């Protein structure tokens, strides 16, 4: 499996509820490598670009209002198959349909407050990483336990 990067964001509800450490821990325990991390208050412009594919949908304004309502923790994770694996860790978009053991299954109840966003594919991941991070904000590094994470 190829080493990939994906974009993950803890939304304002997850930050306000103090779930940042819990969520970071789940990705770290899985064995993924954190290569970008920052907390920010997204501008309406950034939010509009991020959710641009939904611009013509009736819920677009609500998405922008919510993601700009408080701080967001933006992350870039790296690892073998990280895009698909992150989606499994995160769980279904609708928390009541998310499996127990997933982030949304364990920590969210309502689709409008579903705690976390994760890229849904390679093209989206690249777009979102480039949108939220500059190249200088991403750190290539090798964990000391790398040989224990994946078979070479």
From Swiss-Prot:
The keyword Disulfide bond does not apply. SMART domains: NDK. InterPro entries: NDK-like_dom (IPR034907), NDK-like_dom_sf (IPR036850), Nucleoside_diP_kinase (IPR001564), Nucleoside_diP_kinase_AS (IPR023005). The active site is at residue 117. Its main location: cytoplasm. Disulfide bonds: none annotated. Its EC number is 2.7.4.6. It is found in: Cytoplasm. Coiled coil: none annotated. GO terms for cellular component: cytoplasm. Homotetramer. PANTHER family: NUCLEOSIDE DIPHOSPHATE KINASE. NCBIfam families: PRK00668.1 (NF001908). This is Nucleoside diphosphate kinase. It comes from Prochlorococcus marinus (strain MIT 9303). The gene is ndk.
């Amino acid at each position: 499996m190829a080493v990939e990067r994906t974009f993950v964001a803890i939304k304002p509800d997850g930050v306000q509820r103090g779930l940042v450490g819990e969520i970071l821990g789940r990705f770290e325990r899985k064995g993924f490598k954190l290569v970008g991390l920052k907390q920010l208050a997204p501008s309406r412009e950034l939010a509009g670009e991020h959710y641009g594919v939904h611009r013509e949908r009736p819920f677009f304004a609500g998405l922008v209002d919510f993601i700009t309502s408080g701080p967001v923790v933006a992350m870039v994770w790296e690892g073998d198959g990280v895009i698909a694996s992150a989606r499994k860790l995160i769980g279904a978009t609708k928390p009541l349909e998310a499996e127990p053991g997933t982030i949304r299954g364990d920590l969210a109840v309502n689709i409008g407050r579903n705690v976390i966003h994760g890229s849904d594919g390679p093209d989206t991941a690249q777009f979102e990483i480039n949108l939220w991070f500059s190249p200088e904000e991403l750190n290539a590094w090798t964990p000391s336990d790398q040989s224990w994470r994946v078979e070479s």
